[in-house]
Amino acid sequence: MKFYPGQNISEIVYHFQSNETANRLDAYFACGCEEDTEVLARLKQCNPRLLHLSYAAFCLEMGSHSIEEMEYDDGELIFSYFQNFLLSIVSNSSKTTKLRAYIRSAFAYHFQHFVEFDQYTNDSLNTVDTSVSAQGIADLALSMVRWIPTQIKKVVNFGVGSVIESFSEHFNKLLMQYCPIVFQAFSWVNNIWTMVKEWIEEAAKEISWFLQGCKELHAWGMCILASSCALGLVEKCLISLGMISESFDLVGLFVRSAIVGAFCVSIKTGKFVTNSELITCATIAVSTIATVMSQAFKPSEEIKGQFQALSVLEGLATQLTSFCDTSLVAMGKTCTAFNQICTAGKNVKVIAGRLLEVVSNFVRKLLGLDSAFLRDAALIFSQDVDGWLRNISWCQEQFLLKAYMSQDDLIVLRSLVVKGERMREQMLEGEVKVSPSVCNLIVKGCEEANKLMRESRLHCSKTIRKIPFVIFAHGESRVGKSLLVDRLITDFCDHLEIGEDAVYSRNPSDPFWSGYRRQPIVTIDDFAAVVSEPSAEAQLIPLVSSAPYPINMAGLEEKGMHFDSQIMMCSSNFLEPSPEAKIRDDMAFRNRRHVLITVELKPGVEYDESDFTKNQRYLLKTWFHYHYVVDQTFESYADLLAHCFTKWERHVKEQESNLSQIKGKKSESGHFYNFQQLMDLAVSWNLNADIMKNRIKAERNDMVYVFSAGRKDKILHCFLNKEGECTVRPDSIDDPEAQALLKASETMLMKAYAFLKYNNATNLIVRTHLAELVNEDFYDEKFNFIGTIGTPAFHRQIAAHLEKMPLWQKAILCGMGHCLSRKSKETWYTGMKEKFVQMMKSIYETEVTDWPVPLKIISGTILATILGTTFWKLFSFLRDAGNGGVFVGNVASAFTTSSVLEAQSRKPNRYEVSQYRYRNVPIKRRAWVEGQMSFDQSVVAIMSKCKASMRMGNTDAQILMVPGRRFIAHGHFFKNLTQKVRVQIVTSEKSYWHVYDPDKFQMFDNSEIGLYTNPTLEDIPHSAWDLFCWDSEKTLPNNFSAELLSCKLDTVTGQYYPRMAPINCRVHRQPIHITEGNYVRKQDVSIEYDACTIPNDCGSLVVAKVGNHKQIVGFHVAGSKGRLGYASLIPYVEPVVQAQSAEVYFDFFPVEVDSQEGVAHIGELKSGVYVPLPTKTNLVETPKEWQLDLPCDKIPSVLTTTDERLVGTEHEDMTHSWWYSKYATPMMPLDEEILSKVAQDMVEEWFDCVDEEDTFEEVSLSAALNGVEGLDYMERIPLATSEGFPHVLSRKNGEKGKRRFVTGDGEEMSLIPGTSVEEAYNKLTVELEKCVPTLVGIECPKDEKLPRRKIFDKPKTRCFTILPMEFNLVVRQKFLNFVRFIMKKRDKLSCQVGINPYSMEWTGLANRLLSKGNDILCCDYASFSGLITKQVMSKMAEMINSLCGGDEKLMRERTHLLLACCSRMAICKKDIWRVECGIPSGFPLTVICNSIFNEMLIRYSYEKLLRQAKAPSMFLQSFRNFISLCVYGDDNLISVHEYVKPYFSGSKLKSFLASHNITITDGIDKTSATLQFRKLSECDFLKRNFKQMSNVLWVAPEDKASLWSQLHYVSCNNLEMQEAYLVNLVNVLRELYLHSPEEARRLRRKALSCIEWLQKADVPTIAQIEEFHSMQRIMNAPDSNDNIDLLLSIDLLGLQGAARPSQIRLWFDDKLVLANTQEFFDGNFPADSWLPIFVNCLYPVSQLPAEAVIVNVVCGSGRGGLPTTAWISSAVNNRSSDINKKIRTALGKGKKIVFLTRVDPFPVALLAVLFGVKNEILSSNATNPMLTRLLENCKSLKYLVDECPFAFVN
């Protein structure tokens, strides 16, 4: 089959009616295709008749749209082209609706017959036959179609009025004839054409002066738009009210038929012959109108992706450019038709200009019609000549108002000059052909802009200015810094639309700023490469400032020039200022570089001549605390440029804000302060050297030529003398010499005008109205003022002042008026405009009259689209107006008045939340919303935190921000972006540039949305995580109410307006297919709702109430039928590191408060949740005589804010801020390269220490809980300590810590199944591999002795962190072998955890330090535990994994456990805090990790300091050879070899660490401002000194101040006061012995004499102490406990005796038995007949019977395992004690008593005997012999006679 333009329709009819075609169609119907949809397959089988009709319509349309001759094989036409056509138009969702409309439209268009389909043909049997109801409206359309050609034939040349009247008359007549119900139902129809007239009249007011001669074109286009819109509205209203059941594409029928008729007539009547190409071109234009109107008002059955961004001009741009085969297609393609042309223009006018250029070229080639109007219109629209001329006039006004131009104004003027020169260049080269008038217009504009530029760039402000924006490129030589700066300059010039002459290249060696003309960009290449005076660094300081800065200029006319450039770009090999730069403060130089870029080459990437940036890497650095930190690293130039643009825009906003807040702004001043200076300038400019010599000798009344002024047809030369007298000499306007003087006077006039503006001698009235006085027509030939200022009444008030103006002032103002072409009341712009209109209006009108109608319609369509502003506003309102009765009502209200109704607004700032974009912007209801809707705090949070937009050109896409530098977006837009593109991210608070990388956008399975992740995105608060419903499919019911939230850009105002609407949603579980052009994607489950969504709605959020809070449940992605919307459910996204498990007990704040870098207050515990904390100290002050007259500066710490010691002091109202202050400011990031090197060096040392027997696998839970017997450093977990949160909440009275969650005998313990700890442990082991676990710690004040200054001067109590029990268990499992290795190898490694200070280890430590010399740094850190960052912790995890190995799972688990410490939640009383740094003190690895961190810091500092000092490389690689380091937590000693002392000293170390936010001081004198080397004997370590006893022995005496405090305060937690004091006294004597044996001897004697109860045998002699130390030195046992209090822990001491399970049952009496606990659990002692008494069994109360008695005794020192005296007195001797009462009660009920124990039965047996005697089960006659014999063998129990006499006698 052959198709060609102008083909007779009979040929096509013959083709589809032939038998051969019928046979091929039958064969085609019989052959099924795999890609056939279900509906299409059914049609082929059941309804081939419909497909026959569709093939006929397909061929008819193929023929009518043929552009050139095309021939197809019949089989290929059917099986390929027709098949693809059916696949595109028949879908399972839309079924045959679109196909039927296509057939009806084609047959009505070609045959003027309406095709009716019977009920069988419809898809649903319930569909009502529409033939009757639609007949009237169908006849209306066909009649309208037939009328238009006839009417056009009558009035081919009719004007605007006849067009409107004819259309309205026939339109109303047909409605009345065929569908009178329309007038009854819709009275607004009568107002349609009245409003069309209003639209055209309004457009005429707004119409550009250039278009005054083409109103007829505008009328054509407006009538087509209005008619199409009206038909679409009528049709939709009829559907809404049920008068017809479906659309008949009336708009398409109307516009296509009307145009065809018009073409047929114009072929015969027009001046130019209309050919088929012009018909096709015009058909495309009006078809675009039909498409837009149909999509707006005709519901589509197909589910369409609603980010189409299509309008009339977009459709025209797509189809006309393709059809005309012009170069527009090559302008770039991005996403949609809109973006094909978007790169060529920035607004609608530009697109229209390009289209008119296409049409102009098209008709010139086809018709030979060389249209001046089309050529001129194409240029004027595409280049926005009108706006260009307006801006030039605006610049003139700015100069006259201020007598100078600011740098911002100057940038605008420069862009205008560049644009004008570009247009002039195009005209000169012949690229653009326009009429002479337009050419002259552009030339005049260029001349005026250049003239203003020449003069204004010498006039600048002398007030406070914007600080210039500085980009500083640093790097080694030959890395391309200069090329990079040049590239940045080019891109900034393009961004600002200025030319290359806007860049000034500064040579710092030049004392003058030669050639500086206030260029906005200044560049300095090879900054500071050459020594200059002053230095380049010194010159930069005043330049980058807001203070006025006059610069040194060579020429006299340039004197007074001030620097005000806004951008500076430098390249340099030097990062820091030179020492010879003579800068007193280096920070002043550093702070002046806003973007500091270190340029380096990518290793392994070759140089590319086509793009030198491909092998460059850019490190953005900032100076922070004495150190340069790499903030960001960019691998591509595009990312760097986006960052620079973002920083530039923020800098400009900041400067504008700062300038706007300055009060008392300094008044402007000109360059001249008196008249004499003005005269001197005139003399210097206008006279040669000889005359100037004579003038010096001239008298004051000698006249001097000053300037020439133009006035109408004359040139007046003005002469002044020193007295201010003026004479005028006229000259002819044609005299060449006079013209030269006039042109040369322009600069002088500008200077003189500035003098008048700012000279105080100028009359105040004149200065006020100076800009209005600049007018050539206001002065006669003698410069008398003849004008009028303001109203006549106002002018009369100031006339006297104006008449008194000196003659020379009037001459200046008249000359300025001539110079700037200002006459009468008009500006330069109005004058140019009126001249052009007078000349070209009639020319255009005459030309347009002769055009063929199709060309009028094409051009009119384009013009009406641009100018119909009010129409498009109404159109947008009606498009969004909903369905049904709501739609009809909105249409009626719209046509009742010419103004668009606004929906009621909502303001979200009724809630107290953080700043966001919507605070001062009303949130509006959607147009189709009927009722009100709620707006609570959750919605405000969603809009302010999560809602954002991505702008690309003029395209704006809504996106959903997700915590973790991510956003969710719709696929049908973002999947079409295949190349990197620079976009703008607009959030609620700000906007920033970003380079979108399509490789980082990943679609979710079976969903239309995807996730984009990029580290260069700015993150949102992580508290927003709870605003998402991550499990919508399970959480949401099938039907629910929700709100649709959107925020789209208003293209008119340029602002974002949030909108909302309530919707009723349904979970749609049937698959849908979302289409957008060729894009198709299947979505299995969707949210469906009734909503009149429109294009650009994609990205709107569906927010519903989930539980008690509103959450985001869906993301709008498509619409269907004009009334249905579809949203994707929010898929699950892996969360970022956030603590979640304990949040059930928390109430979070909407906004974080007291937020600092490392810590923030985020919430509080819920009401009723209480975490017990100590409020009373366990430290008891001893009696005065016990203190032995020794000094003590330490007292118990403050544990509560209500401490009575603070009452009445300034600290009475102190808060708990002391605990988090150490986390407020973590250390600065470290250089990753050097940190990795340091870590690798440490790991290599670890490997050097590994023995064959060392293993690092994880241990079992049993080993983690119980330790390993006989293996050093593998002790069991302390069970007396707290169990952590949230387990502590379930603790009952009498239960203690971790012990209530374990069971077993004394040696083998295990977790009790079913407890909260056991469940949390199991969950943690499962989840640990996947993510960093939740970690919630309790901050508990530490009960310890502190110096008085930390109590009264500045209260500061240390806290320790209690972590959950299950977390500590898992940590022990994964790291116990590593900890054992580090402690065991302390003799070789720097870490000294486990050192025994009494042993020879101390001597070995001293020798290690002295091996490098006796110059030692003794250091102390401030807030050490809060310094560590995730960077360091992550590196530490790598180090441990490198040593310990294991599979990927185990290494990942270790990493997650360590990282959990650096991102956790902390509970301090009722407050919940987020902590993002540091190591919690309750972490099992705290001391080990702190030790490793301490060593890393010292090694890192060593590496950096030696590198900076350029020390020999051998020193860098030999840390162990030159440094001897020992660390224990935050304690360290650093012995420095004399070779490296010049590079690594205390002062250098202190300064370097301070630059990283780390404060380090002298460990001995913490108040010292310096850190100096000390001798070993002057240092301390672990609060112990180094004392040399002999050549081979060093001892470690503890600081005496710490010793004396032990005698003033004792801990009575586990001991009685006397026993606790005795323990402390023995320890003090042992320590004091190391200081001096004689001093220890004197103290022992004094204690025995002063303390009465003290026995000599209780206190060891000096000989015994000496033997103690001798024994310690020969032992190699570790000291795994940090202080004496831990040594007294019952978990470590246990009950005296061997900890072996007892298997003996001991009967004291038939009513009293001692047995092992296991016998009870075996059922041998049933609770109904026995009273079980558990003694120190550690069983949880919940695991024991209610009747059981639990006895937890506190063992006394030296009491043979029995409890303390106080406990015996209160529990045993006291007959009314709780235990005694329960025993007697049980005996009264006939029960027997059984004492149960898990370990040594001896102490429990004694207790059983004592209780038995006390409660008369046993008699003293029986117990006396037994106890007497026992005392003979166990002397330590002799106290029983005195304490328990009842056991011996009655």
UniProtKB/Swiss-Prot annotation:
One of its GO terms (cellular component) is host cell membrane. It catalyses: RNA(n) + a ribonucleoside 5'-triphosphate = RNA(n+1) + diphosphate. ATP binds at G475, E476, S477, R478, V479, G480, K481, S482. Disulfide bonds: none annotated. The chain crosses the membrane at residues 881-901. The active site is at H972, E1008, C1098. Residues 1414-1544 form the RdRp catalytic domain. GO terms for biological process: DNA-templated transcription; proteolysis; viral RNA genome replication. Residues 449-614 form the SF3 helicase domain. GO terms for molecular function: ATP binding; cysteine-type endopeptidase activity; RNA binding; RNA helicase activity; RNA-directed RNA polymerase activity. The modification O-(5'-phospho-RNA)-serine is found at S905. RNA1 polyprotein: Specific enzymatic cleavages by picornain 3C-like protease in vivo yield mature proteins. Picornain 3C-like protease is autocatalytically processed. Its EC number is 3.6.4.-, 3.4.22.-, 2.7.7.48. The record marks Q308, A309, Q904, S905, Q932, M933, Q1140, S1141 as: Cleavage. InterPro entries: DNA/RNA_pol_sf, Helic/Pol/Pept_Calicivir-typ, Helicase_SF3_ssDNA/RNA_vir, Helicase_SF3_ssRNA_vir, PCV_3C_PRO, Peptidase_S1_PA, Peptidase_S1_PA_chymotrypsin, Rev_trsase/Diguanyl_cyclase. It comes from the Viruses. Keywords: ATP-binding, Covalent protein-RNA linkage, Helicase, Host cytoplasm, Host endoplasmic reticulum, Host membrane, Hydrolase, Membrane, Nucleotide-binding, Nucleotidyltransferase, Phosphoprotein, Protease, RNA-directed RNA polymerase, Thiol protease, Transferase, Transmembrane, Transmembrane helix, Viral RNA replication. This is RNA1 polyprotein. It comes from Bean-pod mottle virus (strain Kentucky G7).
